[in-house]
Amino acid sequence: MDNGDWGYMMTDPVTLNVGGHLYTTSLTTLTRYPDSMLGAMFGGDFPTARDPQGNYFIDRDGPLFRYVLNFLRTSELTLPLDFKEFDLLRKEADFYQIEPLIQCLNDPKPLYPMDTFEEVVELSSTRKLSKYSNPVAVIITQLTITTKVHSLLEGISNYFTKWNKHMMDTRDCQVSFTFGPCDYHQEVSLRVHLMEYITKQGFTIRNTRVHHMSERANENTVEHNWTFCRLARKTDD
């Protein structure tokens, strides 16, 4: 880290580009474990690289970093029940040299009480942008809610009737809304209300991430994802 960066407060936001995935956190979080590689990087003892946008760049597994960052925030390891990439996550923990995380991954005891399970809601906003307009023009935006909590999807269908004309796709575990270039403010309003509704149902935001794609010569696609989780108790059938 450059000496000039020390003017930042430890709670100021820092954006990391991990394998093409952007994460925003604080210096306090990144240096929670001073003996780790991240603690050395952001404590000034280890060289850092930046991408063309000025974000700190780490050439590692982008999707798995969400679990590393969440551990830094809470000092707890919380994984989805169907998580299968333990070996890959151990390699990431070894790379970042976070000893408490390594111990958690090597500990055979269950991550959750045996009578509970984790419910997950994924909210994504996929926005297609024109490359050649100035200012940048939004071509289309799609909001998608994906979850196995059917009561939540039913609530969204019942309480968000104001946006019914934009509801383009409903499936067993998914509801989607599509907005055209003139509906930007409506999409933002719905997104804010959806986040409020999801959190009021007892979910807490676990992770946010941004992914940039270029699918066509004249379009860029930007995808924002928010993951919400809550613990629920198992019921006897």
Curated annotation (Swiss-Prot):
UniProt keywords, alphabetically: Cytoplasm, Growth regulation, Tumor suppressor, Ubl conjugation pathway
One GO cellular component term noted in the UniProt record for this chain: cytosol
SMART domains: BTB
Ranges where the record places region Interaction with USP21: 113-187
A single MF term (Gene Ontology): cullin family protein binding
Region (Interaction with CUL3): 10-110
This protein's name: BTB/POZ domain-containing protein KCTD6
The organism's taxonomic lineage, starting at the top: Eukaryota, Metazoa, Chordata, Craniata, Vertebrata
Gene that this sequence comes from: KCTD6
